[in-house]
């Protein structure tokens, strides 16, 4: 082969390899992409059928029913409500009236079967360990509006 033909074959090979790699990356990205839907969107059939998605809203008051590791509750956005079934241990912050995000699929019976449940918290959340450390070490600095830890040395 002439040098020009060799270069052409090399360029075509590189372009083909980059194209295959890009297709594989996009396919992997698309299969791991999980969208967020509100209960109103799920009720309006905007959520994908047979595919995982995230359902977010508030845990409806009085809806939590525990049966061993199986927990049933209702997620609402104050417009529509979707029943959820989850098997596993719930996060410590999971409470009625608080925000929650559940990842899973909508069953044929209209019940959202969650694989994972995440409890949402507001921006003022502080882990219990940090709150205890702050109480032991000192108070908060009200002038600045932020929490300050005072270091004490023996």
From Swiss-Prot:
GO terms for biological process: cytochrome complex assembly. Residues 131-154 are annotated as: Disordered. One of its GO terms (cellular component) is plasma membrane. The chain crosses the membrane at residues 8-28. One of its GO terms (molecular function) is heme binding. Heme chaperone required for the biogenesis of c-type cytochromes. Transiently binds heme delivered by CcmC and transfers the heme to apo-cytochromes in a process facilitated by CcmF and CcmH. NCBIfam families: PRK13254.1-1, PRK13254.1-3, PRK13254.1-5. Belongs to the CcmE/CycJ family. PANTHER family: CYTOCHROME C-TYPE BIOGENESIS PROTEIN CCME HOMOLOG, MITOCHONDRIAL (PTHR34128:SF2). This is Cytochrome c-type biogenesis protein CcmE. It comes from Methylibium petroleiphilum (strain ATCC BAA-1232 / LMG 22953 / PM1). The lineage of its organism: Bacteria, Pseudomonadati, Pseudomonadota, Betaproteobacteria, Burkholderiales. The gene is ccmE.
């Amino acid at each position: 082969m002439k040098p020009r033909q060799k270069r052409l074959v090399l360029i075509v090979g590189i372009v083909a390899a980059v194209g295959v790699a890009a297709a594989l990356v996009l396919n992997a990205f698309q299969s791991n992409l999980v969208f967020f839907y509100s209960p109103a969107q799920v009720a309006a059939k905007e959520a994908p059928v047979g595919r995982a998605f995230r359902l977010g809203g508030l845990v409806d008051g009085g809806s939590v029913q525990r049966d061993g590791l199986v927990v049933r509750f209702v997620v609402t956005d104050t417009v529509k409500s979707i029943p959820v079934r989850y098997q596993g241990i719930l996060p410590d912050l999971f409470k009625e009236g608080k925000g929650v995000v559940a990842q899973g699929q909508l069953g044929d019976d209209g019940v959202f079967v969650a694989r994972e449940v995440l409890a949402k918290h507001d921006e003022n959340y502080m882990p219990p360990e940090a709150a205890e450390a702050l109480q032991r070490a000192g108070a908060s600095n009200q002038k600045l509006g932020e929490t300050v830890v005072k270091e004490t040395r023996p």
